[in-house]
Regions:
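FAD-binding core of FAD-dependent oxidoreductases
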Residues: 55-109, 135-157, 163-180, 311, ...
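Alpha-helical scaffold/interaction cores of sigma-54-like transcription cofactors
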Residues: 1-48, 66, 78-136, 141-142
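Metabolite-binding pocket within alpha/beta catalytic cores that recognizes anionic/polar moieties
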Residues: 51-53
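C-terminal auxiliary extensions adjacent to catalytic cores
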Residues: 2-42, 48, 74, 135, ...
Length: 483
């Protein structure tokens, strides 16, 4: 069980424990005291001034923000459930992501900035003990902020208890979805990148590519830490390989592998940083600031915290990296099959009828899927369904969906790259470097070397699916299992 004490409890590591590993959470006694103290201070502030303006508490929502409520109207307004926000449908979020949103929702509560009761906080935390959470669509989300997905997730709580002033609003405001989306992508991207290293290292060995592209002397010439990490990873994976290398340089698609993997390292690192900062940020609107010397009852004001402007560009960065890696993989598959370039048996034929050349045709289609998904995510160009104040939507779910498409496409290309590299080693009777022996065995357990013509598609699909499963597995690392 993960104990939540303060904002510092909302780390990417704890996100992984709760969202991916299924841990429950416990609100610490000190946090409960702070939550209850903030709730009391907020209510005192509300009672102290009949003319105070607090969005969604003494005023209406959205285009009705101009409306003002007296004390009786405030409580009636607080009890209303906005079922209208549950307008989206399509592609429900995976359970791990929904759990992540619930976890991220709690950060606004933990130090009292949402000014809700500890009872409500306990109800939200208890959702993480349930076997199934309400479905949250990932398509059709075009709202300002995150009222649509959060309405799908939390509206049932508003029916199960009497909600106090501001409590309904605190459930659906802020940007916990963006925090969870960034965290989910960061975790899966790190695992997918780890697998990509192994596939490209296997391809380097398959071609007998000179290892100068990863030469240790480059550590003194290049300065970006991501580049140095990529160089070291590739050196570790290819160590002990065939000493008989090509005597001339490999095609560009092999020589730039360290640089392109370094680009991916950079984008994944940025994602991890954005996820960490987003998870621990207070994003409620309106937000409550506890009492200080100048404001003995605290103060409340409106913010734009519901719009995370860092998450979707960071997710886009990973998507673009997957597209670039898919392009490298496509090029390498084609070159491995072409004896004029690879100096391997033409088309990697083990026998006359063991043709696998169509692999390149499939790969180019999958890499094109990744490239198309890498279109940059921008703020929506139309107000669309925005009314009054709600005139800009948050595009984070769109970037997440594009990332998923590009990731699955890259997995397909990596699967075909692994199969092609495996075939190259088979027809030349070579083994993989020590660090890749088990990895090659896993590939061959799903797609054995081709000795007679057969339909590769169904087998490679299994391998691609195993890659996709590995990147979201509960394990701390992504590994292919021998089937």
């Amino acid at each position: 069980m993960t104990s939540l004490v303060s904002r510092e409890s909302f780390s990417l590591e704890n996100y992984h424990k709760v969202a991916w590993l299924g841990e429950s959470v416990e609100i610490s006694d000190s946090a409960i005291a702070k939550i209850d103290g903030a709730r009391s201070g907020f209510l005192s502030l509300l009672e102290s001034d009949d003319d105070i303006v607090i969005y969604g508490v003494t005023s209406g929502y959205g285009q009705n923000a101009y409306q003002r409520f007296d004390k009786e109207q405030r409580q009636a307004h607080a009890g209303k459930v906005s079922f209208a926000t549950s307008a989206a449908f399509g592609d429900p979020a995976p359970e791990r992501l929904v759990r992540g949103i619930v976890f991220a929702r709690l950060v606004n509560f933990i130090e009292g900035h949402a000014a809700v009761s500890s009872d409500l906080v306990g109800r939200v935390a208890a959702m993480l003990d349930e076997d199934r959470l309400p479905p949250v669509p990932t398509r059709g989300i075009g709202c300002a902020g995150e009222i649509q997905p959060l309405g799908h997730l939390f509206n049932h709580l508003s029916q199960e208890r009497v909600m106090g002033v501001k409590e309904n609003l605190a459930l659906v405001n802020g940007s916990p979805c963006a925090s969870a989306l960034a965290a989910d992508v960061a975790l899966s991207a790190r695992r997918r990148l780890d697998l990509a290293y192994r596939f490209f290292a296997l391809s380097i060995e398959a071609l007998r590519a000179p290892l100068e592209a990863c030469d240790p002397s480059l550590d003194l010439l290049w300065t970006a830490p991501e580049e140095l990490r990529a160089l070291q990873q590739l050196r570790d994976l290819t160590l002990g390989g065939d000493p008989d290398r090509r005597s001339f340089q490999a095609p560009v698609s092999w020589r730039i592998v360290p640089r392109v993997l370094a680009q991916a390292e950079h984008t994944v690192g940025r994602l991890e940083s954005v996820a960490e900062s987003s998870l621990s940020s207070i994003t409620d609107n309106p937000v409550y600031i506890p009492p200080d010397a100048d404001n003995p009852l605290g103060r409340v004001f409106s913010t734009g915290g519901y719009h995370n402007g860092l998450a979707y560009p960071a997710i886009d960065g990973a998507t673009a990296s997957w597209a670039d890696l898919a392009t490298l993989g496509d090029r390498q598959i084609t070159k491995l099959l072409d004896s004029k370039v690879s100096h391997l048996p033409d088309q990697l034929l083990a026998k006359e009828d063991g043709y696998i050349g169509v692999a390149g045709m499939a790969a180019v289609a999958y890499q094109e899927e990744a490239r198309r998904a890498a279109q940059v995510t921008l703020l929506p160009g139309s107000e669309g369904g925005g009314f009054g104040q709600n005139d800009i939507g948050a595009p984070t779910f769109w970037s997440f969906n594009q990332y998923g498409t590009a990731g699955r496409a890259l997995d397909a290309v990596l699967a075909y790259l692994g199969v092609t590299a495996s075939q190259a080693l088979h027809v030349t009777d070579r083994s993989a470097p020590p660090a890749l022996i088990e990895f090659l065995e896993a590939i061959r357990s799903m797609v054995p070397p081709v000795t007679d013509s057969r339909a590769l598609g169904p087998e490679v699909e299994i391998l691609a699916e195993q890659i996709s499963k590995a990147v979201v597995s509960a394990s701390s690392t992504a590994d292919l299992e021998v089937l």
